[in-house]
Amino acid sequence: VIRSSLAATGEEEGFHENPNLLKPREAKKKKSKNELKREGNWEKGKGATVSNRASASSSASAKATIEIQSQLTKSFSLEEIFEIVRERSAEFDSINASTALHRIASKGTKDVVENDARVRASTSSTSVSRVGRRSTTSSAATTGFERRRSENEHPYERIIRNKDFENLMQSVEDNVNDMDQFGLANVAWSLARLRVLGNEDGVKDDGEKKMLDLIARNFAECVQRQGGASVRPQAFSNFMWAYGSFKYKIHDENVLKKIYDQLEISWAENADAWKPQEMANLLVGVAHANNATDKWSFYEKVQDCAIGNLKTNPLIVNDRNADQRFSFTARDISNFLWGLSKSLKSQKFNAQSIDSELISLMLQRLVAENFGGKQSALNVSMTVWALANCKCPVPPRFMEVLNQEIPRMAKRLSASQLDAIAWSIGEAKQTLQYDNDAIDAVAEAIAENRESVYNESDPELVAKIFWALSRRGRVPADKSIIDKLVKKVELCSDDLERSDKLLILHAWGVLRISPGEKVVNKLVRTFVEDGEDSDDDHGDELEPDECAKLLCAYGRIDYKPSSNTEYGMKFEKHLQKLAKTLADSAEASRLNPGTLALGLWGCALLKLKLDEDVLDLLARDALRQTDSLKPNSFAKCVFALATLAYDPTQDDLAKLVKKAQQTIFTTNYSSSSDANINNGDDGPSFVANESTKEEVRIALIKLGADSLA
């Protein structure tokens, strides 16, 4: 879940077409690059040569440098800063250049946000990204800012598109090799804050990439030379946050290694200097730019640093004069957990990678702060996504309060926030114990999404909530919620991707929802027509698991058009193709046991008349994998083989009976759920209830078993 890439400043993410501000400019008060080249006083990648820099240094004395710096720090308006740039940029050294850019970025953007209602509207609506099956990039509904982008407008037009800013950028380029780590971090932060580089997808031109690589390389050299314990945490934080804002991956592993090695030293030896916001923004930046490392000590040390802070700096409430900078707030916690979780998962670390003590301390703090009050919607959605992403166990008290909070805030959740919570409901059913009221509240909020009757975020969001409900086996108590969600499916069916249509059909089957023939036809026609258009017999390249889910979904919702109609005949052909795909996979021994069971059961529910060869291949594979089948899947297979009138050999039948006695007709196999054949959960714990035992007993007798004692 991605909070705004400009989370450090509370601004909404967004990147813009390159205004080419980092390219060589025309001549200004001081000599241009071309003039310096002609004079032999320019080195590529380094700017002016030593002799030329020495000349400039003599003209801009140390006294002038100090004077300029004083003027910049005492300037309180954008106009004052630009006046200094206009009059004295030729005298700027590395400190002056980075300071001027930083002052313009911090002061100028604040002025624009305060004075431009359009920008304020776009920056006040922070959101989380869409998550789950397809992507982790932001796909929230189009904002006012994005609409302005399509018209080639820029929120900071008057700041960055003028001659004075170009002159300043030239000065930054000329001095970048002389900047220390803090100056470089300020330059990176300022360019990100002003949204100068690239577009919202992170696409940069070659000149921009070279500049970012140069800044990163110089920053790495500076922090290594300075030593991590002596580098201000803010420099590390601003630098990594900026690259996350750029969505720019640093490809030179040696550069990242130098930075991360010094970060580890800083967290270990200078932990008390780190503010929570600095830790959180750094992790957000690392994750957002995909700059995560596979070095475990990096994550271990940042967690240790955070734990130390949480123990040392309690939350201060009801004291406006207290210094809160070193106390974790709800916002810091949600950012920290999101960045940490996303980076850990990208490097395939397991659920135990996030320290249980850290989780406990942070979630206690979240509850104590009421999830951040007005910002609870954003904080909750980010936090539960992070917890679900790494399957983190959570304290019961946290879930108790969370289950109370979600119904209260559900009506003000944005589409992307609902998306994040819905995904966590489906993804983490073992670790996040949502109660029925919380689940129903999220489903209702999606059903009644007030952003519009139908908008571009709805198709995937509606599919996701049906998936989440099916994972929990939950049908909302208020039946109108399902009716409204089904109506949304009907409205946006043409915009649903094929995978989402399959997901919805499968969920309807699991939940035993009867949505009506009209909307089912809209979804099913996609698969029937795709299969009809294909030249092979494999259902338009549907994967075996997709075939199994479709067969099972059709059977569960009892969808089988009359074979006397043209469409009915096409549908029958479609079913046979699905079964043939499963059989081909079974023949090649590539069929997953769970997929096999689901497909066979779907065929049985549909009472499908399979070709003898197809049935034999599926049955033989079920017998071959009998020992691998989980009890619930085994029960499905036995039921299906009996329903489809398979004739097993005596040896095969004995094998089925033995497996049934060990798993179905025993109380010693496991102890957990009271599952039966209709349960879609194929988990490891299974205790057959009396209904399942009777169904399996009858099925085995149909297959020819004499005694089941």
Feature-to-residue mapping (PLM):
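Eukaryotic RNA-binding helical-repeat scaffolds
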Residues: R3-A709
